[in-house]
Regions:
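Nucleic-acid processing machinery
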Residues: 1-3, 10-233
Length: 233
């Protein structure tokens, strides 16, 4: 619980960093990128990690941040349209094949992760093609594998990008099936398939585990405590 409070406090500081002197701002941003974001990742707090990284990026490399944010904003309408062209038929295909689907939605890529891809591949933004992501939430683990089979039957996957983090969870407890397929206009789509419980763990990591263990059950109590944690953040 102490770690959660520390991370929430750091996130609050990063959101208000503009009011601090430049030297202190740089120090805090670097510390956030190098220490607090990896800490959030270690405890499975993926949404916290992503926001900390983006905020650190904003202050440590402001020119690159502004340029990338502008490009992402300019292409948002086209990305949303293309994501819909993939998500709608994907959900329809799953339901037609009897998969119990709770949600199919676009998953935005964070600026820092896009920037790191550009750096690693030495390519500009308009040549990074795996920027599209979709999340599929289903009823249970068998439905995860059922959904994966249906998706691979309808869209061609990249074999080297299929990952089973359900059978082999990450060290922070993260579980999902990952695949990358060719969607509309030959665009690559990264697809995550998970249950709602896996989604809670992916978003809130140790917080979800701590609350679940404390309550000894899920349901309304779990949701109530996670709502508290969201409010803290």
């Amino acid at each position: 619980r102490v770690i959660l409070v520390k991370l929430a406090d750091r996130l609050h500081n990063m959101r208000t960093l503009e009011w601090m002197p430049e030297e202190k701002r740089q120090r805090i941003a670097m510390e956030t990128r190098d220490l607090y974001a990896p800490m959030a990742h270690r405890f499975g707090l993926n949404s916290v990690k992503a926001e900390l990284e983006d905020l650190a990026f904003k202050w440590l490399e402001p020119d690159e941040y502004r340029a990338l944010a502008k490009m992402v904003a300019q292409t948002r309408a086209d990305r949303d349209k293309l994501t819909g062209e993939m998500a709608d038929p994907l959900e329809r295909r799953l339901r037609e094949n009897g998969v119990v689907v709770h949600e199919v939605s676009g998953r935005p890529k964070h600026l820092w992760s896009i920037f790191k891809k550009m750096e690693k591949r030495a390519k500009p933004y308009d040549e990074i093609y795996d920027l599209y992501a979709i999340r599929v939430m289903v009823e249970n683990i068998p439905e995860c594998y059922h959904a994966l089979g249906v998706i691979h039957g309808a869209w061609t996957p990249l074999q080297e990008r299929i990952k089973d983090y359900i059978a082999s969870p990450k060290s922070n407890g993260y579980q999902s099936l990952h695949t990358t397929v060719f969607g509309p206009r030959g665009t690559l789509f990264e697809i995550q398939i998970r249950t709602r419980e896996m989604h809670r763990t992916a978003e809130y990591g140790i917080a979800a585990h701590w609350v679940y263990k404390a309550e000894g059950k899920g349901g309304k109590d779990l949701d109530r405590h996670l709502a508290w944690f969201r409010q803290v953040l």
